[in-house]
């Protein structure tokens, strides 16, 4: 009996499999799956509702309609199991076989499979080397194709029209064979000898010169090799037999009223069967060719529609005009099999309800309505009731629960105790969107949620709903408690800062309790303990904000964790003393002895977590919340109209601005300024007026003057409610207060341009109709934007998750020695991100030395925690090599050392952590906060971009980075290199600021000189680009002929004349070939050379250059020979926000990218063509020169004869990530993408750790292009996973063979997701048909390595707790121990089962 149960359990388990292979099915294979041929299009008999014989629902083919009962009713009950009824031919078995038994249709004429024909690139076309158009013409009977040319002049695969065919017949008779339709294509495919083709193409490849032809041949070779290695035969792409889906997967359901609801597939199959039968009959009758042809074409079309409706021609529609859903539609898209049923399922033991606040809960609790709990925990309750003997059977227990007997509630309490439940709020944007809590039973119907977890869920209580899920098994409960409990998720995985931070009311209450007030009641009292201070407050002797002296007791935790108490007297307020009571032992009182805003509270919690650990922090957070709520109530802060104080200065400031605007308007009308300038100036005037008003308002609001107890006036922070809310960070911001009490300011039109008349009123004064109308513009656009943003952000997250889903920590240390070098991020002079924030939680890649010595400060493989970062700061280290995911050497995963600290836990990351998904969520989750718009640069912004000097902010020492310079006659330095940077170093050697300085900058100080804050140290002209001479001498004009290559112009204002070089297009034919230049000679007229080389000092002048010198003039080093006017670069729109992030991760090439030098060498210009310049770079080592054609309108940064390094910018523009990777390497491209993405997020004040972006970049760099195949089996130009090549190369090197050489390639995230090795993952992402077609042709197998594939096949994922499970299975496999089934034969089991059932039957 036990054996039987074991056997039945065993039946549920499928055999273990290690992968899934996809391939083409041969006609014989399809027949072997089938249980019979479907010959008739009938479905079921409409009177008896029984399936028709040999029809689409035939019981004989597919199995019985009722369990263990044949169709005619001769055999019923289990004992006849396996009998085939002789009357109706139905096997007596379970009805569920109708879900798995397939049928088939023998097609009267072969039919091409539309996926292999039409999904691009067409596989059949590639195989036959014919165009898709031609093949379609053959298939749809429009022309003939030659199959066997025989002894004629025709060629195999040649297309013949009807006339050509008849002509050929007359000429050659039956020497040759030509056909049309799928038979023709079938014959052509059959005739291909794969081995021979491969040999031929391999021989042919090296000799091909044309790039396109080579690409085509490689593609074809890869396809044919795929067929050859996978054992697929090309003719299987043409169907001779069509499989029929099991009927229960395309059900026909009777509705009431005699109608039927049916799956579209039945209609499509019926069409195919009808046409197939008609074709058979026509062939039997030997009908005229044209009729048969038409029928064959129709059969082809109906099969196309069944497989992929709408891919060719118009989609076949049903009775209600909508296209029928074909087999391809069943699996693709959001509603398809993959995304609807395999990746996301509905689960039982779940419920949902509205949420409300639970301010009395502890952090690990949630309030669960009794009704819900009763329903969710039913099986547990039944079990308990039965176990206690309160109910004899499950049925009785059920009745008790339905009647809600008193005992049931006691049992429920017991069941629920310590049984965590999971709460989830949609949309689940990151892993904190599902957390576990211990339920507390409550009355009512709403779930109660702890206020501190709202931030993680992004929940509010305006009607949000949440879902509850019950973990059933012990393991599930354990995981929920250990990993998902809200108390274990205090830090955000995105940036490692606390996410359980009080907000709103709580912040306001804590801020209120910690404020001080001048001359408050009880000021200057002294208390011997905190308790005494509190007593004084409770009896009313002192108020909360009074400044007093209190003796406090602090616990100090020493180095070794020993605790010592110490007492001291502090100046504080009563409120802060009371607040210090909840401070956990071990934290200093100074942390609360300040105004507690949101930032301070967050820091306090962070410090608490780092110093005292999880438990204390959780308790403390709860206490903070209770205290905050209590004192927020006591504070009575509320918003009244009198709190919005309008500054008196407002009206005069507005009047001044209006006067200025009128003045500009007058200038415009008299033609002194252009329309554009006028608009920009007006907007600037109003923007600055708005700033001034809001400044005056904030000064007015934020402080008040009071009389202190010595009778003197003293300023103190104001207790204005609105100001307190904003200052504490509880709600609102200066910008919002400005609209309430300042002026509303400038508004934008929906297209993003600014309306030049601002709204001068504020909300307290009220808006008039026009002002209100202008406001609605922006407000409505905001709403529309939000809707778009949500969708876009969600799609970005989906792509990120898809590309990174298979990255898991799989080993401890890969031993990689290289890493990324981290420096503080400095932008335009400010330190945006100090070094400690960038390296915190990373592992050191190379020993960090004490600056200036060779003594090791932090050895390799140190995990830099807070203490180490403090050390680095003390010793002013300004660059650290840290290990990074990008340089990790692990194949198919990442090692813990390269990843560093797990941000959500604060220690080094665990094995099996799914870092890819965490990274994707961290980047995607704040997506909705990013803006959607592209910024038009106008007004203030565009002038800021035309900087012309560097003003230092900090005192320090001047240092130049990769700069070449010459000293001019005034003794100043002139920069003559391109990408130079200037940095200010403080006395500790730390870099404080850094600026880019262009070519031609004049420096007022020498390198290494001391500079003071506010000093201007560098100047340049932003509107022209000078040509600086590096030698002194006299100038000689070359090819500068007036009227041919140059013209003279006289400046109207100054009367000075200057020479302007004509552009090539403007010159006469005589001047086209001339190259105007300035040559430098000494006093004797001999050519001078550029110092250190034998290159003559000759400077070629580009078109439009202006020369202010005359022939033979004397000049000195560092003077400008000529100036090239720079058109103020067209105000480009900078793509901001979400679209910019998407562009970076998709690695899109910008429209007009910067042009970078492909090789290092010397620049020269070759012969020009119409509209283009020829740029030639001659390498210094005398290799082949590199040529590139550059459009004339691009501003070049280089002159003839200048030396450039590989990857240097030649023409400005946005840099393309692909170019950076190719020319400057992986480290640079990684830095570029990380910094660009971070810029967008930083602008919105969102913190994301660099690690997460690096994880995505690793996935973007996962493929490479083979440049030299060596002895490997890769093809040149093939795209392969880097890990694959590395593994292959290791084997080759071990065998002493030539390894393959490769070049890394950067793929956008969509491309990278579709290019994964796992076809299941790729198919469930996008372009399902294309992915599956490609996989089938190549006979790919999926090893189920990633997370997504395992979810789809219904296994534990190989990450987290499933990581060990997969590891153990791999071990068991390696040692060959497969799980053995118990020794019981099927017949024994049947016998046992029959006995059992008969026993049960006799008892009834």
From Swiss-Prot:
The record's section on InterPro entries has:
DNA-dir_RpoC_beta_prime, DNA-dir_RpoC_beta_prime_bact, RNA_pol_asu, RNA_pol_N, RNA_pol_Rpb1_1, RNA_pol_Rpb1_3, RNA_pol_Rpb1_3_sf, RNA_pol_Rpb1_4
Q: Which cofactor does it need?
A: Mg(2+); Zn(2+)
Q: Which residues bind Zn(2+) 1?
A: 70, 72, 85, 88
- Residues that, per the record, bind Mg(2+): 460, 462, 464
Biological process GO annotation list? Answer: DNA-templated transcription
Residues given in the record as Zn(2+) 2 binding sites? 814, 888, 895, 898
Respond yes or no to whether keyword Nucleotidyltransferase is given for this record.
yes
Q: Which keywords annotate this record?
A: DNA-directed RNA polymerase, Magnesium, Metal-binding, Nucleotidyltransferase, Transcription, Transferase, Zinc
Offer an example of a GO molecular function term for this protein: DNA-directed RNA polymerase activity
| Cofactor detail note | Binds 1 Mg(2+) ion per subunit.
Record's function text: DNA-dependent RNA polymerase catalyzes the transcription of DNA into RNA using the four ribonucleoside triphosphates as substrates.
Q: Summarize subunit and interaction data from the UniProt record for this chain.
A: The RNAP catalytic core consists of 2 alpha, 1 beta, 1 beta' and 1 omega subunit. When a sigma factor is associated with the core the holoenzyme is formed, which can initiate transcription.
Protein name in UniProt:
DNA-directed RNA polymerase subunit beta'
What species is given as this protein's source? Shewanella amazonensis (strain ATCC BAA-1098 / SB2B)
């Amino acid at each position: 009996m036990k054996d039987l149960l074991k056997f039945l359990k065993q039946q549920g388990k499928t055999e273990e499999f290690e992968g899934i292979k996809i391939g083409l099915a041969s006609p014989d294979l399809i027949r072997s799956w089938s249980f019979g041929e479907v010959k008739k299009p009938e479905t079921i008999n409409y009177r008896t509702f029984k399936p028709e014989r040999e029809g689409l629902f035939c019981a004989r083919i597919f199995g019985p309609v009722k369990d263990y009962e044949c169709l005619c009713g001769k055999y019923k009950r289990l004992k006849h199991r396996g009998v085939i009824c002789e009357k109706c031919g139905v096997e007596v078995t379970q009805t569920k076989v109708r879900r798995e038994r397939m049928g088939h249709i023998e097609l009267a004429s072969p039919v091409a499979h539309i996926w292999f024909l039409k999904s691009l690139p067409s596989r059949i076309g590639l195989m036959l080397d014919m165009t898709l158009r031609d093949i379609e013409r053959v298939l749809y009977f429009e022309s003939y194709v030659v199959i066997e040319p025989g002894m004629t002049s025709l060629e195999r695969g040649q297309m013949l029209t009807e006339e050509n065919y008849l002509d050929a017949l007359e000429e050659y008779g039956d020497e040759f064979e030509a056909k049309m339709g799928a038979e023709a294509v079938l014959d052509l495919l059959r005739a291909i000898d794969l081995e021979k083709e491969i040999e031929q193409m391999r021989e042919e490849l090296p000799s091909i010169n044309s790039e396109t032809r080579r690409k085509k041949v490689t593609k074809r070779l890869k396809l044919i090799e795929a067929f050859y290695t996978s054992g697929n035969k090309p003719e299987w792409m043409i169907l001779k037999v069509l499989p029929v889906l099991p009927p229960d997967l395309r059900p026909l359901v009777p509705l009431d009223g005699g109608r039927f609801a049916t799956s579209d597939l039945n209609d499509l199959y019926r069409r195919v069967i009808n046409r197939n039968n008609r074709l058979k009959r026509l062939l039997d009758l030997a009908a005229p060719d044209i009729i048969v042809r038409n029928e064959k074409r129709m059969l082809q079309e109906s099969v196309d529609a069944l497989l992929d409706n709408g891919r060719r021609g118009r989609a076949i529609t049903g009775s209600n005009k909508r296209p029928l859903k074909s087999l391809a539609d069943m699996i693709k898209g959001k509603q398809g099999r993959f995304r609807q049923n395999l990746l996301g399922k509905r689960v039982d033991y779940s419920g949902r309800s509205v949420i409300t606040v639970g301010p009395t809960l502890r952090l690990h609790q949630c309030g669960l309505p009794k009704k819900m709990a009763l329903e969710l925990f039913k099986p547990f309750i039944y079990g308990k009731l039965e176990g206690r003997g309160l109910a004899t059977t499950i049925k009785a227990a059920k009745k008790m629960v339905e009647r809600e007997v008193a005992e049931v509630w006691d049992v429920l309490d017991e069941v629920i105790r310590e049984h965590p439940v999971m709460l989830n709020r949609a949309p689940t944007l990151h892993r904190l969107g599902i957390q576990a809590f211990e339920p507390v039973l409550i009355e009512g119907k709403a779930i109660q949620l702890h206020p501190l977890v709202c931030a993680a869920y992004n929940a509010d209580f305006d009607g949000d709903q949440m879902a509850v899920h019950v973990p059933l098994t012990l393991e599930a409960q354990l995981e929920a408690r250990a990993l998902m409990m809200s108390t274990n998720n205090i830090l955000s995985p995105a940036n490692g800062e606390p996410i359980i931070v009080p907000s709103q009311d709580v912040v306001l209450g804590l801020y209120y309790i910690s404020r001080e007030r001048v001359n408050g009641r009880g000021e200057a009292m002294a208390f011997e303990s905190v308790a005494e201070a509190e007593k004084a407050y409770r009896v009313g002797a002192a108020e909360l904000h009074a400044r007093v002296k209190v003796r406090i007791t602090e616990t100090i935790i020493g180095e070794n964790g020993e605790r010592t108490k110490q007492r001291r007297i502090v100046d504080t307020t009563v409120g802060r003393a009371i607040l210090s009571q909840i401070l956990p032992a071990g934290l200093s009182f100074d942390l609360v002895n300040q105004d507690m805003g949101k930032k301070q509270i967050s820091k306090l919690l962070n410090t608490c977590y780092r110093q005292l650990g999880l438990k204390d922090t959780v308790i403390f957070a709860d206490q903070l919340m209770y205290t905050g709520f209590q004192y927020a109530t006591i504070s009575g802060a509320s918003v009244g109209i009198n709190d919005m104080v309008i500054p008196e200065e407002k009206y005069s400031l507005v009047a001044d601005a209006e006067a200025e605007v009128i003045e500009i308007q007058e200038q415009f009308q008299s033609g002194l300024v252009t329309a554009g300038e006028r608009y920009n100036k007006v907007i600037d005037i109003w923007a600055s007026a708005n700033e001034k008003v809001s400044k005056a308002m904030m000064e007015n609001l934020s402080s008040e003057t009071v009389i202190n107890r010595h009778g003197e006036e003293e300023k103190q922070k104001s207790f204005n409610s609105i100001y307190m809310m904003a200052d504490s960070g509880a709600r609102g911001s200066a910008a919002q207060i400005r609209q309430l009490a300042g002026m509303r300011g400038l508004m934008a039109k929906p297209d993003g341009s600014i309306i030049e008349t601002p709204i001068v009123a504020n909300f307290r004064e009220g808006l008039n109709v026009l002002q209100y109308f202008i406001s609605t513009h922006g407000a409505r656009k905001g709403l529309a934007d939000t809707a778009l943003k949500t969708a876009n952000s969600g799609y970005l997250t989906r792509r990120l998750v898809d590309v990174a889903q298979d990255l898991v920590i799989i080993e401890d240390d890969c031993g990689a020695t290289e890493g990324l070098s981290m420096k503080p991020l400095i932008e335009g002079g400010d330190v945006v991100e100090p070094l400690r924030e960038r390296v915190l939680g990373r592992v050191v890649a190379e020993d960090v030395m004490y600056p200036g010595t060779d003594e090791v400060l932090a050895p390799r493989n140190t995990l830099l925690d807070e203490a180490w970062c403090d050390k680095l700061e003390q010793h002013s280290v300004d660059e650290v090599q840290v290990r990074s995911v990008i340089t990790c050497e692990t194949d198919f995963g990442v090692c813990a050392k390269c990843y560093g600290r797990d941000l959500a836990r604060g220690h080094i990351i665990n094995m099996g952590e799914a870092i890819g998904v965490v990274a994707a969520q961290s980047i995607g989750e704040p997506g909705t906060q990013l803006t959607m718009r592209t910024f038009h640069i106008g007004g203030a912004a565009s002038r800021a971009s035309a900087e012309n000097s560097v003003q230092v902010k900090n005192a320090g020492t001047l240092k130049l980075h990769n700069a070449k310079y010459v000293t001019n006659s005034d003794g100043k330095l002139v920069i003559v290199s391109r990408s130079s940077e200037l940095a200010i170093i403080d006395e500790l050697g730390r870099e404080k600021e850094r600026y880019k300085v262009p070519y031609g900058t004049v420096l007022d100080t020498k390198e290494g000189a001391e500079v003071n804050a506010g000093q201007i140290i560098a100047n340049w002209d932003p509107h022209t680009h000078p040509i600086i001479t590096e030698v002194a001498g006299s100038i000689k004009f070359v090819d500068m002929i007036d009227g041919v290559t140059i013209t003279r112009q006289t400046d109207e204002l100054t009367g000075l004349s200057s020479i302007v070089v004509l552009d090539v297009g403007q010159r006469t034919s005589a001047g086209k070939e001339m190259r105007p230049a300035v040559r430098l000679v000494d006093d004797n007229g001999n050519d001078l050379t550029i110092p250190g080389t034998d290159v003559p000092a000759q400077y070629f002048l580009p078109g439009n250059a202006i020369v202010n010198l005359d022939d033979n003039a004397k000049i000195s080093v560092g003077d400008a020979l000529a100036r090239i006017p720079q058109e103020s670069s067209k105000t480009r729109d900078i793509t901001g926000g979400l679209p910019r992030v998407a562009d970076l991760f998709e690695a899109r090439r910008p429209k007009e990218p910067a042009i970078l030098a492909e090789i290092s060498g010397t620049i020269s210009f070759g012969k020009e063509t119409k509209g283009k310049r020829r740029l030639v770079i001659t390498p210094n080592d005398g290799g082949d020169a590199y040529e590139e054609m550059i459009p004339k309108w691009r501003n070049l940064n280089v002159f003839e004869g200048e030396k450039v390094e590989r990857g240097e910018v030649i023409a400005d523009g946005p840099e393309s990530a692909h170019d950076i990777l190719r020319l400057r390497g992986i480290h640079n491209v990684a830095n570029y993408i990380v910094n660009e993405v971070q810029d967008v997020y930083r602008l919105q004040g969102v913190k994301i750790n660099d690690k997460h972006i690096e994880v995505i970049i690793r996935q973007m760099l996962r493929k490479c292009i083979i440049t030299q195949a060596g002895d490997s089996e890769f093809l040149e130009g093939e795209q392969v996973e880097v890990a694959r090549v590395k593994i292959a190369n290791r084997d080759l090197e071990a065998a002493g063979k030539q390894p393959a050489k490769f070049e890394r390639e950067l793929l956008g995230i969509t491309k990278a997701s579709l290019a994964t090795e796992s076809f299941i993952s790729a198919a469930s992402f996008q372009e399902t048909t294309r992915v599956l077609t490609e996989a089938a042709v190549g006979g790919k197998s999926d090893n189920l390595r990633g997370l997504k594939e395992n979810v789809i096949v219904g296994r534990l994922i190989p990450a987290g707790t499933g990581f060990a499970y997969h590891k153990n299975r791999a071990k068991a496999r390696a040692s060959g121990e497969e799980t053995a089934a118990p020794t019981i034969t099927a017949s024994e089991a049947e016998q046992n089962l029959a006995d059992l059932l008969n026993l049960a039957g006799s008892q009834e």
